[in-house]
Amino acid sequence: MMQNKKIIVVCGNIASGKSTVCRRIREKGFVVIDLDEITHQIYEQGTDLYYKLIDEFGKEILDENSDIDRKKLSKLVFNSKTLLKKLEELTHTDIILRVVKRIKKEKSDLIFLEISMYLESKNLVDKYINVDEDWVVVADRDIRIQRIIDRNNFDYDTAVTRINSQLDYEKKISEFDEVIVNNTTESDLILKVDELIDRKKL
């Protein structure tokens, strides 16, 4: 594993505020590689994964243009931990290898990785990437449920199902180098990010 760049992972559960944190980090001029973005790329028609997903989950995950419909796929797997695990097995290695390529191409000596499900894929990440620090964004469960309802127009039960499909990172904060608590406003969160970057002298 050859790598002479500083890598900081930013992760967090759904509706924790992770994307807002990473957006602010970008605004401060840092490189952020978003693993969700890379996931979009590997789902494109013609990729090996495209055909594997159809074999595994059926053609009902396709839209009218025969593209993978991520909303349909998400709805399918989030209702079953078995199917979610299968999706992760199919996608994670491919995603991480693409991230490694991106890291090598970047000229910056400091790179942030935005990863939704970091703890679930940590062993795989550590196999290919030398992570120097990991930061987690957390928020109270009830607050996250309300954010999902407001943001995605989901009902309460659907929001709870989404949250229950993930490990609760709030219970794992001792495993992280930095914890960013996001229970109030977006402006408060941005201020916390700025203060953390200043404290780290990045």
Place the predicted regions along the sequence by residue.
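Small-molecule kinase domains that catalyze NTP-dependent phosphoryl transfer to phosphate-bearing small molecules
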Residues: 95-99, 107, 124-127, 150-199
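P-loop (Walker A) phosphate-binding loop of NTP-binding proteins
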Residues: 13, 25
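Hydrophobic anchor at the beta1->P-loop junction of P-loop NTPases
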Residues: 10
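Post-Walker A helix-loop "phosphate-sensing" segment adjacent to the P-loop in P-loop NTPases
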Residues: 27-35, 47-48
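ATP-dependent NMP and nucleoside kinases share a basic, alpha-helical "lid"
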Residues: 98-105, 113-147
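ATP-binding Walker
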Residues: 16
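Walker A/P-loop
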Residues: 19
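ATP-dependent small-molecule kinase phosphotransfer cores
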Residues: 37-109
